[in-house]
């Protein structure tokens, strides 16, 4: 398979992070783009919540979090909770959520 990635190393702490739209404009047509970071941008997200993390989760107040990938049960998540260690379940969710399941099958 052929792949293409765009990575940028910040050389100075003061360098501003670009907006996601500006980065997406650099890409050609794609069926799916997976993005890490940009948690405050308005795009669908899968939040990772690990046991023992002291970080406050986004999902209670962020409607753009469409699922949570976790290594523990989250009974009050009010959205799908995916097993963090089951990459096939996560990939299947992404394909269904993005209506790609028919193309992959």
Predicted regions and their residues:
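Conserved NTP phosphate-binding and transfer environment spanning the P-loop NTPase/kinase superfamily
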Residues: 61-105
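Short, hydrophobic beta-strand segments that form beta-sheet elements in well-ordered domains
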Residues: 33-35, 46-50, 64-71
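Short, Lys/Arg-enriched charge-dense amphipathic segments
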Residues: 23-29, 55-70
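Conserved C-terminal guanine-recognition region of P-loop GTPase G domains, centered on the G4
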Residues: 40-61
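ATP-dependent carboxylate-amine ligase catalytic core
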Residues: 1-46, 80, 91, 101-105
């Amino acid at each position: 398979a052929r792949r293409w990635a765009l990575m940028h190393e910040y050389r100075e702490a003061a360098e501003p992070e670009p907006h996601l739209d500006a980065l997406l404009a650099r890409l050609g047509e794609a069926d799916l783009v997976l993005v890490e970071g940009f948690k405050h941008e308005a795009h669908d997200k899968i939040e990772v919540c690990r046991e023992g993390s002291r970080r406050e989760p986004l999902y209670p107040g962020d409607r753009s979090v469409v699922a949570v990938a976790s290594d523990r049960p989250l009974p009050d998540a009010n959205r799908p909770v995916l097993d963090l260690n089951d990459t096939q379940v996560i990939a299947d969710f992404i394909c269904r959520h993005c209506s790609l399941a028919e193309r992959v099958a």
